[in-house]
C-alpha cells in the first residue's frame, strides 16, 4: 500500500503543480518538504479522506489523474492563502513542516467532505476547484500562526489556556493532533455558522 502514496508524491514532485521540486528525496535534495510527511498525508487521505473515492479497492491503486488534480488544487490554494509562508523552510515556518503538511491534509479531507454535500448544485464539480479550496482555507487563516506569534488552542480540561508559540510545535503526533483538531473543528464551526445564517 505504501508504494502508491509514494508514487503519488513523486507525481506531485516531478509534475507541474505547486509542489513541483518541493519534496525532499534522494534525487531532489533541495526540496523543503520531508517526503515522509507528504507520503503519510497522502496515505491517510487514501484510507479515509478525499482520495478514498478515487481508489480501486481491488488493487489499492486508483485514478491517479483525479487524485493528482485534487492534491494540486488544494496545495495551489495553500500557496495562495499562506503565500508568506510558502517559501520558508520548516525551521522558519511550520506550514511545510510535518505539522503543517499533516494537519492541512486532514483539513483538505474535511473541506472535500463538505464539498460533496453540495452535489447537484449548479456549478458543482466532483473535485473541489482551486477557488473553492481558497475560499474554505480563508475561513481558518486568521487562526494560524505558522511562522510567528502563538496558537491559541482553547482550554484544557482544567480550564487552563493551551497556548503554543509557533516554533514550539514539533513533528510529534501530539502536536500534529493538536493543530489538526483545532483547524478541523474551527473549519466545521465556520461552515455551520454559515449554514445557520
PLM feature spans:
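Accessory terminal alpha-helical modules
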Residues: 1-197
Amino acid at each position: 500500500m505504501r508504494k502508491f502514496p509514494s508514487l503519488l508524491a513523486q507525481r506531485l514532485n516531478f509534475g507541474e503543480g505547486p509542489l513541483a521540486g518541493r519534496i525532499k528525496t534522494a534525487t531532489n535534495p533541495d526540496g523543503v518538504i520531508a517526503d515522509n510527511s507528504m507520503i503519510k498525508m497522502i496515505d491517510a487521505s487514501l484510507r479515509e479522506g478525499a482520495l478514498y473515492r478515487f481508489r480501486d479497492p481491488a488493487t489499492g491503486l486508483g485514478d491517479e489523474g483525479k487524485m493528482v488534480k485534487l492534491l494540486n488544487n488544494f496545495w495551489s490554494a495553500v500557496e495562495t492563502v499562506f503565500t508568506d509562508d510558502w517559501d520558508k523552510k520548516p525551521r522558519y515556518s511550520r506550514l511545510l513542516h510535518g505539522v503543517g503538511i499533516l494537519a492541512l491534509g486532514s483539513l483538505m479531507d474535511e473541506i472535500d467532505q463538505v464539498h460533496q454535500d453540495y452535489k447537484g448544485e449548479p456549478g458543482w464539480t466532483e473535485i473541489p476547484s482551486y477557488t473553492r479550496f481558497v475560499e474554505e482555507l480563508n475561513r481558518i487563516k486568521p487562526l494560524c500562526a505558522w511562522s510567528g506569534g502563538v496558537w491559541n488552542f482553547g482550554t484544557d480540561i482544567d480550564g487552563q489556556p493551551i497556548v503554543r508559540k509557533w516554533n514550539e510545535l514539533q513533528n510529534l503526533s501530539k502536536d500534529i493532533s493538536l493543530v489538526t483538531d483545532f483547524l478541523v473543528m474551527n473549519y466545521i464551526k465556520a461552515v455551520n455558522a454559515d449554514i445557520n445564517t
